[in-house]
Amino acid sequence: MPDDEEKLQLLADVERLKKILRQKDEMLEEMEDDLKNQGKPCSSKLSLEERAQELSEQLRDLHVEMDGKNATILDRDALIDSLRSEIDKLEKINKEFANGSVIPEHDDSNSFGESEMLRISEDCQKYKETATALYERNAELEKEAVNLKDEIESMMDHIRDLKNHMETRDEEIARLEGELFDERNSHEGKLAARGNSMFSEVIDAERKVEEDLKVLHGENRALKGMVKRLRMEVEEVEERLRSSTKRFNVTRMTTSDIDVKEMRRLRDRVCHLETERVHLWERMFIKMRSIPKREVGALITGYFKSFELSIASVKGGFDGLMKDNEKYVTIIRGLQQEVENLKADIVQLQFDNKCAHRKAAPVVNKDFEHPLLAAPLKTLNNGRPSFFIKPKNVEPMPQLGHSLSSIAVTPQKPAAKFTTRSSIKDDTSEWAERRMKAQAEKKLATPTPRYNYIKLSEPVPKFKPAVLQMPSTSETKEN
């Protein structure tokens, strides 16, 4: 029956070790994925490539060190379990001795052994609490690593979207440049045929458009160069990823072989410790029967001192594990800082992309505007809109062809004062010409926001257009 229990215990230990190995494999795969994802968004600078190589080397060293620490932890766990079981058995034996025999009160060795047992039990409890805290901390670090992995994957998706967006924008810019060139060549003959009065304005507009096109062409070349560099970096990262994947497969095969050897070594170690424990108990019972009862406490105290030394060595191992955990925490914080830097680079790329589109949009819109609409506005110097200049004593009154709400008014020069009867006819003809000009401008194009125009609601019965009081020249200057 004890053999069956020992077999079950060994099977449970083997399952636990397999579970730990699976967890380590998963952690290794996650760290490899993190390294792969962190290598993709690197810029063209050599410092980032060197940093990626250093991180990969550090990660490889950490894997090797982690495997060694895992083996040490397993050895220490087995040793702690064996020591705890022996301590429990010794406590049971001590209780049996205390119940079966009467020890005099003046026996100092017995009191010393009890105090040592209490102190050692307290130390064991502290070590248990420390181990529990370490396990919890390791679980938190694993969760944090998983969160960082998800965040890096989302960032890589966002970078891929930005890259596709930049490519589409480059194609759109190239298409708009071609359309702009064709439109400029098609309108060149029309603008030249309008006469020498607009020739200077056309030359200025053409010069401005050419300057803007030069700027856009330079920006387009810079963006194309950036896209080319990014593609080369992506290809280089993919090549490094393939090589690292091959190395990882070889490393995984070697580590699996090492894990099998480690399991065999642990199994042999467990058998050796079991035989050692049996021989120890046999020697202890022989000595307890051969020596008087007063010396039993000193014997137990000696065994406890040896246990204390072994536990002190285990404590030193735990201190080393704590230092390793602190080192891993600093490494994770460094990776978080690198993630923040990558986010800042993404925001900067978005801002540069928006600036390029904003620079390209005004030039394209400006070239397609009508030449008459692009003329500068004239300032109003105590003038009135021509629409509200009412002729005096003219029969019959001209009828409006449409409602007042649909007429767009453009600023004109101030009207001259009426001095004679002949000036009334001239003013009437000017008013009719201005009205026809306003209707023609409305048919040509919809008024843009850069022109001043007045819109009225539906005409009221018996409506009389009022004369607007425009500010004087001195008031406009003061404002």
From Swiss-Prot:
Keywords: Cell cycle, Cell division, Centromere, Chromosome, Chromosome partition, Coiled coil, Cytoplasm, Cytoskeleton, Kinetochore, Mitosis. It is found in: Chromosome, Centromere, Kinetochore; Cytoplasm, Cytoskeleton, Spindle pole; Cytoplasm, Cytoskeleton. The keyword Ribonucleoprotein does not apply. GO terms for biological process: activation of mitotic cell cycle spindle assembly checkpoint; attachment of spindle microtubules to kinetochore; cell division; embryo development ending in birth or egg hatching; mitotic chromosome movement towards spindle pole; mitotic sister chromatid segregation; mitotic spindle assembly checkpoint signaling; positive regulation of kinetochore assembly. Transient kinetochore component required for chromosome and spindle pole alignment and chromosome segregation during mitosis. Functions downstream of the RZZ complex to mediate kinetochore-microtubule attachments and nuclear envelope breakdown during cell division. Required for kinetochore assembly and localizes the checkpoint proteins mdf-1 and mdf-2, dynein and dynactin to unattached kinetochores. One of its GO terms (cellular component) is spindle pole. Interacts with Zwilch homolog zwl-1, a component of the RZZ complex. Interacts with mdf-1 and mdf-2. Transmembrane segments: none annotated. This is Spindly-like protein spdl-1. It comes from Caenorhabditis elegans. Residues 4-180, 210-250, 321-357 form a coiled coil. The lineage of its organism: Eukaryota, Metazoa, Ecdysozoa, Nematoda, Chromadorea. Disruption phenotype: Recessive embryonic lethality. Hemizygous mutants are viable and survive through embryogenesis, but are either lethal at the larval stage of development or sterile. The oocytes of sterile mutants have extra chromosomes and prematurely exit the prophase stage of meiosis which results in endomitosis. RNAi-mediated knockdown results in embryonic lethality. It comes from the Eukaryota. Its main location: nucleus.
